[in-house]
């Protein structure tokens, strides 16, 4: 068994965010992970779920680990600039997403006057 195959097996046994960061050699701030652990793991899981779908041939451990590392970096960076509320990855947050406020530009507003009001105004101008 090659070193990469062993590393891939170890990847499959990881159970904490820190284990993934250490195994894939990704630098991280423990404070960011402490606050966003579940969000990072969820984002990471969604990222790797779509990797190599429909690949005709078996993907090598080297390619898998490289792509897993890139996915973990994307997941981590997503939460260094935004919060869990911004991403809303979990159902409880999706369900409580605020409705966007309606916006109507003033150029879209038209005022229509009833016909009687227009004739009254014309009579007043005389």
Curated annotation (Swiss-Prot):
Transmembrane segments: none annotated. The keyword Magnesium does not apply. Pfam families: NifW. Residues 104-126 are annotated as: Disordered. Keywords: Nitrogen fixation. Homotrimer; associates with NifD. GO terms for biological process: nitrogen fixation. It comes from the Bacteria. This is Nitrogenase-stabilizing/protective protein NifW. May protect the nitrogenase Fe-Mo protein from oxidative damage. Belongs to the NifW family. The keyword Acetylation does not apply. InterPro entries: NifW (IPR004893).
